[in-house]
UniProtKB/Swiss-Prot annotation:
Pfam families found in the cross-reference section: Asp_protease
Stated name of the protein: Nuclear receptor-interacting protein 3
GO biological process assignments: proteolysis
InterPro entries, alphabetized: NRIP_C, Peptidase_aspartic_DDI1-type, Peptidase_aspartic_dom_sf
GO molecular function, one term: aspartic-type endopeptidase activity
Length: 241
């Protein structure tokens, strides 16, 4: 009986030791899991922790990434868009001004007189007709000379999609020592300009010398007209008014 009691007591101690070891092991595993997820899990709201499970998408760091992305997208959508629109408008405006400046640099202008006033005329080999804008007609006081377009049903081939609103049958232009009496189509344009078309340039036997910056007129008695500095036609002709 004595030995039996000793064996029973020894068995109990061994059982207690095993249970204690098992509890310690469970606590260590629990602490390890908590340590692994501490930095990310503590930052998550409780509803994000309820269903972590074993899925990769449901792990704390993935949930955090999704929340951050959702927050950033929400800020972008609700943030002010005016600065971006303003920046885009400025870029488009700068691009437009750059293209316009490039076109103006390619223009050939010569000094002439029309209706007793100095005008800088554009030498336009890309258009068959002489053109004068409504603004230029107004400045030169030629409104009473404007007549309705003869070929109203006929669409003239004009650059820049200009609209013909009338014509002047006898537009007197003094170019150098030459006095020209030529027709011109009146176009609806805000630019105060006058342009000499290909028909007039051919009739004057004109040669454009880009090396000397001269417009040479005539075949036998040649006359050279120097190019003038290229500036905005609107600003230049306004200053002459």
């Amino acid at each position: 009986m004595f030995y039996s009691g000793l064996l029973t007591e020894g068995g109990r101690k061994e059982t207690d030791m095993r249970e204690a070891a098992s509890l310690r092991q469970q606590r260590r595993m629990k602490q390890a899991v908590q340590f692994i997820h501490k930095d990310s899990a503590d930052l998550l709201p409780l509803d994000g922790l309820k269903k972590l499970g074993s899925s990769k998408d449901m792990q704390p760091h993935n949930i955090l990434q999704r929340r951050l992305m959702e927050t950033n997208l929400s800020k972008l959508r609700s943030g002010p868009r005016v600065p971006w629109a303003s920046k885009t408008n400025k870029l488009n405006q700068a691009k437009s001004e750059g293209l316009k400046k490039s076109e103006e640099d390619d223009m050939i202008l010569v000094s002439c007189q029309c209706a007793g006033k100095d005008v800088k005329a554009l030498v336009d080999t890309g258009c068959l007709y002489n053109l004068i804008s409504l603004a230029c007609v107004d400045r030169l006081g030629l409104k009473e000379h404007v007549k309705s377009h003869k070929h109203e049903g006929e669409k003239l081939s004009l650059p820049r999609h200009l609209k013909v609103v009338g014509q002047i049958e006898h537009l007197v232009i003094t170019l150098g020592s030459l006095r020209l009496d030529c027709p011109a189509a009146v176009v609806d344009d805000n630019e105060k300009n006058l342009s000499l078309g290909l028909q007039t340039l051919r009739s004057l036997k004109c040669i454009i010398n880009l090396d000397k910056h001269r417009l040479i007129m005539g075949k036998t008695d040649k006359e050279e007209i120097p190019f003038v500095e290229t500036v905005s036609l609107n600003e230049d002709n306004t200053s002459e008014a």
